[in-house]
Curated annotation (Swiss-Prot):
NCBIfam families linked: Dxr (TIGR00243)
Stated family: Belongs to the DXR family.
Binding site for NADPH: T15, G16, S17, I18, G41, N130, E132, G210
Entry keyword set: Isoprene biosynthesis, Manganese, Metal-binding, NADP, Oxidoreductase
Cofactor(s) recorded in Swiss-Prot or TrEMBL: Mg(2+); Mn(2+)
Name of protein: 1-deoxy-D-xylulose 5-phosphate reductoisomerase
Catalytic activity, EC: 1.1.1.267
Residues that, per the record, bind Mn(2+): D155, E157, E226
Length: 396
C-alpha cells in the first residue's frame, strides 16, 4: 500500500530508541507526516511532554496511569495546549486502533501485540518494530490484517530482507540470511562468560538500543527472535534461514535466490533508514541516512555463528519448529531472565539457561494445542512462563 502524501502517524513507544528516531525522521519531513498521537510507558514523562509540544499532537497515552498527573504538569510546563491525556494499556490499544494512516510500534515486549492487532483491524499500515508481536502473537497478528501487505517490518534485518525480496518471487527464494554483529562478546567462549556484568553487556559495539534489546543482542537471543520473525513474516521455513556474523553491521541481511544470486541491503548502521521506509513504503524519502562511502577502502567480513557459546539461536529454532506457544514461552521467560540479570539477581549465563529450563518444564503441555485462540490465552501462558522463570531465578 502506498502511504498518503501527508500521512497521520501514531508513535507507540515514542520515548524509546525507535520512537525518538522515528520522530527525528518525521521532523525532517513535515510535509509528509502529521503526528496525531504518542504513547509511552511513563518512565520519561518530561521527554514525552516535549515531544507532544514539538509535534502538536492531539493525544498522549501512558501505560502507567499513575503518571497521568505528572504528565499533565509536564505538558503544561512544555507549553503543549489542548492535549488529551489517557492512561493504562487499554488507552494505548485504543489510540493504536484510532485509524491513523500509519502506526509505528516501537514498544518493547509482548505488551505490544494488542496495539499491533488494534492498528491492523482499524486499517492502519503497521510499521512494526515490536518483534514480540510476531514471536508471541503469530497468527493472531496476521489474522488481524484487513488487506494484504499491511505490515511494514522496521527491524533492520527484516527491512533488509523485505527490500531484497523485491528482486524475485517467493517461489524463487532459496534462503534468507540474517546477519548478526556478534554483540560485545563475539569470539568469547562460554567459559569466558561466567562473570559478565550488566554494565559490560549493555555496551553494544554497533547499535544504540534499549536495555532489554541490548542484552538480547549480547546473548544473541535477539537473533533467535529475528529468525522466528523472519520465518513468519516472509513464510520461509526455519531450515532455509541462515545466520551469519558480520561485525561491521553494513550488510543488514540477504536473500539467496534459486539461481545462486544473493541480494542484500547495505548501509552504515542507522535505524532511521528502516524506520523511514516503514513509514513511507513503497516510496523512499531523500537524505534519510548516510550511504556507504565507496571512495574509501572497506572490508566486510562474515563468519559462522558459534552455537556452543551462543545457544539462544538454536533454542529459538527448536521453538519455531515446535509451535507458536513454544515461541511465546521463549519470549516471556527470556524477558523475565533479562530483567533479573539487569537487577543483578541472575548471572549472565543464567539467562538462556533459565529460558531452556522453563521450556523443558512446559514442553509436553505446549504440544497439545499449538495455536492460541485469543490474546487472553496467550497472556495467561506468558504469565505462567514468567512465574516459572521467577521460581527458577529465585532458587539461584
Amino acid at each position: 500500500m502506498s502511504i498518503a502524501s501527508n500521512s497521520t502517524v501514531i508513535i507507540l513507544g515514542s520515548t524509546g530508541s525507535i520512537g525518538t528516531q522515528g520522530l527525528d525522521v518525521i521532523a525532517r519531513h513535515p510535509e509528509r507526516f502529521t503526528v496525531t498521537g504518542l504513547a509511552a510507558g511513563g518512565a520519561h514523562i518530561e521527554l514525552l511532554a516535549q515531544q507532544a509540544a514539538q509535534f502538536h499532537v492531539s493525544e498522549v497515552a501512558v501505560f502507567d496511569e499513575t503518571k497521568i498527573p505528572a504528565l499533565q504538569a509536564a505538558l503544561a510546563q512544555a507549553g503543549a495546549q489542548g492535549v488529551r491525556v489517557t492512561g493504562g494499556p487499554d488507552s494505548v490499544i485504543a489510540m493504536a486502533g484510532s485509524g491513523a494512516n500509519v502506526v509505528l510500534n516501537g514498544i518493547t515486549g509482548s505488551i505490544g501485540l494488542e496495539p499491533s492487532i488494534a492498528a491492523l483491524k482499524a486499517g492502519s499500515q503497521l510499521a512494526l518494530a515490536n518483534k514480540e508481536s510476531v514471536v508471541a502473537g503469530g497468527h493472531l497478528l496476521f489474522s488481524a490484517q484487513v488487506r494484504e501487505n499491511q505490515i511494514n517490518p522496521v527491524d533492520s534485518e527484516h527491512s533488509a530482507i523485505w527490500q531484497s525480496l523485491r528482486s524475485g518471487t517467493h517461489a524463487e527464494v532459496a534462503k534468507l540470511v540474517v546477519t548478526a554483529s556478534g554483540g560485545p562478546f563475539r569470539g568469547w567462549k562460554r567459559a569466558d562468560m561466567e562473570n559478565i556484568t550488566p554494565e559490560q553487556a549493555l555496551h553494544h559495539p554497533t547499535w544504540n538500543m534499549g536495555p532489554v534489546v541490548t542484552i538480547n543482542s549480547s546473548t544473541l537471543m535477539n537473533k533467535g527472535l529475528e529468525v522466528i520473525e523472519a520465518s513468519r513474516l516472509f513464510d520461509v521455513p526455519p531450515e532455509r534461514i541462515d545466520v551469519t556474523v558480520h561485525p561491521q553491521s553494513i550488510v543488514h541481511s540477504m536473500v539467496e535466490f534459486v539461481d545462486g544470486a544473493t541480494i542484500c541491503q547495505a548501509s552504515p548502521p542507522d535505524m532511521r533508514l528502516p524506520i523511514a521506509l516503514g513509514l513511507s513504503a513503497p516510496d523512499r524519502m531523500a537524505n534519510v541516512a548516510a550511504a556507504c562511502d565507496w571512495t574509501k577502502a572497506a572490508t566486510w567480513t562474515f563468519e559462522p555463528l558459534d552455537d556452543e557459546a551462543f545457544p539462544a539461536v538454536q533454542l529459538a529454532r527448536h521453538c519455531l519448529a515446535a509451535s507458536e506457544k513454544h515461541t511465546a514461552v521463549l519470549n516471556a521467560a527470556n524477558e523475565q531472565a533479562v530483567h533479573a540479570f539487569l537487577e543483578h539477581r541472575l548471572p549472565y549465563l543464567g539467562i538462556v539457561d533459565t529460558v531452556k529450563a522453563v521450556l523443558d518444564q512446559m514442553d509436553a503441555e505446549l504440544r497439545g494445542n499449538p495455536l492460541f485462540t485469543d490474546v487472553e490465552e496467550m497472556n495467561q501462558l506468558e504469565l505462567e512462563a514468567r512465574r516459572r522463570a521467577d521460581d527458577l531465578i529465585n532458587k539461584q
